Amino acid sequence: MIALIQRVTRASVTVEGEVTGEIGAGLLVLLGVEKDDDEQKANRLCERVLGYRIFSDAEGKMNLNVQQAGGSVLVVSQFTLAADTERGMRPSFSKGASPDRAEALYDYFVERCRQQEMNTQTGRFAADMQVSLVNDGPVTFWLQV
């Protein structure tokens, strides 16, 4: 399971002209689900995403996680993160989970974030989405479990 996380000052996702999720300061999480992923990996990745210390403390040091910084999370499904790009000029998506399995694990990941009392907004799984963000820093990390 893969999360591309970006520290943002604001982010939103729109589907068919409707804003489905919007946050101020926090994390934009682009989530990719691979074939061998399961709930245990989703739990571990959620723990890492919410615990990752990439927000500045009073001394300007990256020492706070999103909850400590008072931020929110916007989770957007992105199957392209599971692409195999090592060969050729066209990505292969053979490493990605089936749509049904990926949606179940995406929903599970979102629910785990919410269970941590995290303000968690979302896109719409498998929809054609427009994502807007202001990357703060820029600060972007690839987390994989």
Swiss-Prot record:
Entry function: An aminoacyl-tRNA editing enzyme that deacylates mischarged D-aminoacyl-tRNAs, has no observable editing activity on tRNAs charged with cognate L-amino acid. Edits mischarged glycyl-tRNA(Ala) more efficiently than AlaRS. Acts via tRNA-based rather than protein-based catalysis. Rejects correctly charged L-amino acid-tRNAs from its binding site rather than specifically recognizing incorrectly charged D-amino acid-tRNAs.
Gene Ontology cellular component annotations, sorted alphabetically: cytoplasm
SUPFAM superfamilies for this protein: DTD-like
Motif (Gly-cisPro motif, important for rejection of L-amino acids): 137-138
Substitution effect: residue 102 to F: Loss of deacylation of D-tyrosyl-tRNA(Tyr), loss of deacylation of glycyl-tRNA(Gly), not toxic upon overexpression
Record gene name: dtd
This protein's record includes keyword Cytoplasm: yes
Organism of derivation: Escherichia coli (strain K12)
CDD domains on file: Dtyr_deacylase
Name of the top EC class for this enzyme: hydrolase
Protein name: D-aminoacyl-tRNA deacylase
